[in-house]
Structure formats: C-alpha cells, structure tokens
C-alpha cells in the first residue's frame, strides 16, 4: 500500500471521556498498560505498508506529540513521506476537520499517492488494510468503509454509526446506535478512496457549507457515490466513553482477545520507555492482570490493567480495576469493582 496516504483524523467527540481527556486528546489516552489508543490505528497503517501518514489533531496535543516523537517506533521516520502532524484549535466554531484539510491541501497534492485512507483513532482492532484496498478496487467503489456486525449493541458501541447495507454490501443508509437493537453493522469510520476524490470532497464541503466533516459528506451523498462496505470479523472496541474504555481494558485480559491484538502476524507498536521490570514482593498476590514495567506490587491484584510506575501497598486489594500510570495506592486499601461497574484510578 505504498501508493496510499494514511490520514488519522482526531476530530472525535470527547464529551463522554472528559475526566480522562481534559488535558490530552483521546488518541494519547493510556490503554492496555503500556500502549496509547492511537498505537492501534498507527500500527495497522504501517503494518499494511503505508509510508506516508498524516495526523490531524485539535488542541491539547502535547502528550500526543511526546508519544509520537519522530515516528521511529512505527518505522515512519523517513526523509520521504513518513509521519506528519497537523494541529488546529477547536476554539474557533467554524474551524473543523474539513477546514483543517483545506489549510493543508498541499500535503495531499504533493503526496502523489493514488489512494487516501482516512480513519479515526478510537477504533481498537488489528486490521490489514491491504485486504481493504484489494476489495475496494475489485468492487469498483468510489468509497469503501469498514464495518463489523456486532451482537448485543444495546449495551456496546453506543452513539456509533450504524450502516444499512443491500445484498451487494453497498451502503444505502446510515444511522446511529441508540441501544435499541440486538445487533448492528457498526461503521468503523475507516474510508478508502482515490486521493483526487478526497480533494474534491474537501472543496465541495467548503463550497456548499453544509458538511463540516468528510464522513458526514459521504453519508449525505450515498445516493450519488458508490459507497461499499468491507466486513471486518476480528475483535473491535470503540473508545468513545469511559465505560467503553474500561470494558476494552477488561477485554484485553481475555486470552483470545490478547493474542489476536498483540501476538498476531501484525504487532502493535508503541513508544518504548526504559524502566526496571515490575517488582513483586513476598506479600503480593497477582492473578489475570496486565502490569506495565516500573511498578512495585506489595498487595493483592486480580483482573486489573495497571500502567507504568504504579505502587500498590501491602495489604491493599485491587480487583477489576484500571490503574493509570504513576498512581500510588497506599497500604490496606480495598477496591473491589463488580463487572457491571467501571472505575479508573489515576494521580491528580
């Protein structure tokens, strides 16, 4: 897929993750102990052979820039193509992702790539985009989006887009999951199209003034564009709320999910941080947990995901929790969470 430019658009709704994203974009939110949310989509692109990747982010981007560095952990630190980051502020009510794309239109013109893949960051999966572009070309679509047929969406993937498909997997309608159906075709917000068409969409959005997001333009023109849908059958999580964030971390404790995401043919890369291995004292008791390096465990930990440099004191019992990095939990502290509740513990 060296003939494709990858766009990661961070214009995501963070209203339901405010407590976790007040000082950072959702893309740089720690997940699975040592990773960040953006690692999954970024690794998917590089594993698929995409060498030119642009990340379009809003404000609060310090932690994201610190994490991305020069792109070397993902092998996109290059003289040609490589990683580019474009920032804009969401304080201007008329400045949205379409205007951000317009301000940087030369990036797309000069790329000389035939195809453009535009994605959000909050869809967690392990996906080979080579199969997507192959399907896109075979079907002769103008735009191809990725979806997953998900069961029990009355409790999961709330507020995600739902696709209505015909017998040829063509998109004929787009709605929103409000939790009223048992199953639905969840739109993963990954769109592949010709770069020329993508540029035309940007100008059309500006001229018409009706659409402020590329995905809304696509949804509003499914009668004019041939929009196909490619089915993804692997594990998928959408980090669009604190509840979804917690549930995804708990899913990583499942052996099948963990192997699919982190130990498949395509690995997930992240920025390395040097620290000593986690130390477990004779008073510690740990089971079915993911614990990043640099931590010191004296208490009992069960079914937890724990970030880097966390201290858990003697006599403390932590169960079914997500503990973010640099958290200090003193002695004789007890936090037992039922499976239908959520909690995130972090330092101030």
Predicted feature residues:
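Unchanged
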Residues: 1-250
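Left-handed beta-helix
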Residues: 1-7, 196, 204-348
């Amino acid at each position: 897929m060296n003939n494709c430019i990858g766009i990661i658009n961070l214009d995501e709704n963070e209203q339901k993750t405010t407590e976790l994203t007040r000082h950072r974009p959702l893309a740089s939110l720690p997940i699975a102990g040592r990773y960040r949310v953006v690692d999954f989509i970024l690794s998917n692109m590089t594993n698929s052979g995409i060498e030119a990747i642009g990340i379009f982010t809003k404000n609060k981007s310090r932690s994201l820039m610190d994490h991305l560095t020069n792109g070397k952990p993902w092998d996109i630190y290059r003289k040609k193509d490589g990683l580019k980051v474009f920032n804009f502020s969401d304080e201007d009510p008329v400045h949205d992702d379409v205007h951000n794309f317009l301000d940087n239109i030369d990036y797309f013109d000069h790329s000389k790539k035939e195809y453009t893949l535009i994605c959000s960051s909050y869809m967690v999966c392990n996906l080979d985009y080579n199969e997507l572009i192959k399907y896109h070309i075979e079907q002769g679509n103008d735009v191809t989006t990725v979806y997953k047929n998900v069961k029990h969406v009355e409790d999961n993937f709330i507020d995600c887009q739902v696709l209505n498909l015909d017998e040829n997997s063509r998109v004929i309608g787009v709605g929103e999951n409000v939790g009223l159906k048992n199953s639905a075709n969840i739109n993963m917000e990954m769109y592949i199209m010709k770069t020329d068409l993508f540029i035309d969409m940007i100008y059309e959005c500006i001229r018409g003034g009706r659409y402020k997001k590329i995905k809304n333009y696509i949804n509003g023109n499914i009668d004019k564009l041939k929009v196909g849908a490619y089915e993804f059958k692997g594990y998928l999580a959408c980090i669009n709320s604190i509840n979804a964030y917690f549930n995804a971390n708990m899913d990583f404790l499942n052996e099948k999910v963990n192997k699919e995401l982190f130990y498949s043919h395509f690995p997930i890369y992240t920025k390395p941080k040097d620290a000593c291995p986690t130390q477990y004292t004779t008073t510690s008791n740990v089971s079915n947990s993911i614990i990043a390096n640099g931590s010191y465990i004296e208490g009992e930990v069960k079914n937890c995901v724990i970030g880097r440099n966390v201290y858990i004191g003697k006599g403390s019992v932590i169960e079914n929790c997500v503990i973010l990095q640099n958290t200090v939990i003193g002695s004789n502290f007890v936090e037992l969470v039922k499976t239908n509740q959520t909690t995130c513990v972090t330092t101030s």
